[in-house]
Amino acid sequence: MAPSSSSGLTFKLHPLVIVNISDHYTRVKTQLNPPASICASGHGSNNGEAMFQQNPRVYGCVIGVQRGRTVEIFNSFELLYDPSTQTLDRSFLEKKQELYKKVFPDFYILGWYSTGSDAEESDMHIHKALMDINESPVYVLLNPAINHTQKDLPVTIYESELHVIDGIPQLIFAHTSYTIETVEAERISVDHVAHLKPSDGGSAATQLAAHLTGIHSAIKMLNSRIRVLYQNLAAMQKGDKSCDNSVLRQVSSLLRRLPAMESERFQDNFLMEYNDKLLITYLAMITNCSSNMNEMVDKFNTAYDRNTRRGGRTAFM
């Protein structure tokens, strides 16, 4: 197990990076492991058994900004790296870096990413290869294996530290903590991806069940976190655990937000917005009914006028 980092840097990881890595891994795995229907039809069977890899590794760069002691990872892009020869396509990397610089001039290459359960010794080769771009790159590792018992994200961030082992200075990976940072656009995008409909469309009951299951899981996790927090506070009150002023301040800040929802001003604003929404819905229904009524009148006039002309009379409507 890698040791903990002692750099003191604060890392913030945006969900777009996790989505990009997951998408990269899924595409590569699908290409190397085509569906059974494709294999049976003969397409893709010429690649041989060597092409079927259960857990392929993917590689890419992570970009973002560093402000003082805070490193914020915003985005990522793929790399062309050959693990067998340990060669990195420099021209492709420089081209991608130039393109991203035109769109995001403030973003810099902060490190790289890969997939796997743990950092390997061979990962240090690509890590050292990026040190001419960033002297202290970070390594974001995503574990694609599904573990239903794990509650945390399967993402680990490593830093490289110089340690003296057997009298020889060597670079080793040291894992560091991080927090998930999101902006409004990312929250909307991630929520949209999480609620995408299946390819067959699915029934309304299936979509509702999936939505309610997601809400239930979120409430269940919130309840477990609150229970853990309550147990820690009870232990502090009894003296079984030393008081952590930082935790107490965060709990106090959280509790101060709750009475705001019961204030008279909040209720007035809520009722005002609620009535506005009802009024907009009512006006939309009236407009729709008026439009349908006009269409019906036009059709009736057209039909009546046609019948009266056949009889030699003129329509009065």
From Swiss-Prot:
InterPro entries: EIF3F/CSN6-like_C, JAMM/MPN+_dom, MPN, MPN_CSN6. Disruption phenotype: No visible phenotype when grown under normal conditions, due to the redundancy with CSN6A. Csn6a and csn6b double mutants are lethal at the seedling stage. It comes from the Eukaryota. GO terms for cellular component: COP9 signalosome; cytoplasm; nucleus. Coiled coil: none annotated. GO terms for molecular function: metallopeptidase activity. Gene3D superfamilies: Cytidine Deaminase, domain 2 (3.40.140.10). The keyword Nucleus applies. Residues 30-164 form the MPN domain. It is found in: Cytoplasm; Nucleus. GO terms for biological process: COP9 signalosome assembly; protein catabolic process; protein deneddylation; red, far-red light phototransduction; ubiquitin-dependent protein catabolic process. Keywords: Cytoplasm, Developmental protein, Nucleus, Phytochrome signaling pathway, Signalosome. The keyword Transmembrane helix does not apply. Component of the CSN complex, probably composed of CSN1, CSN2, CSN3, CSN4, CSN5 (CSN5A or CSN5B), CSN6 (CSN6A or CSN6B), CSN7 and CSN8. Interacts with itself. In the complex, it probably interacts directly with CSN4 and CSN5A or CSN5B. Interacts with CSN7 (via C-terminal tail). Binds to the translation initiation factors TIF3E1. Although strongly related to metalloprotease proteins, it lacks the JAMM motif that probably constitutes the catalytic center. Its function as protease is therefore unsure. Belongs to the peptidase M67A family. CSN6 subfamily. Component of the COP9 signalosome complex (CSN), a complex involved in various cellular and developmental processes such as photomorphogenesis and auxin and jasmonate responses. The CSN complex is an essential regulator of the ubiquitin (Ubl) conjugation pathway by mediating the deneddylation of the cullin subunits of SCF-type E3 ligase complexes, leading to decrease the Ubl ligase activity of SCF. It is involved in repression of photomorphogenesis in darkness by regulating the activity of COP1-containing Ubl ligase complexes. This is COP9 signalosome complex subunit 6a.
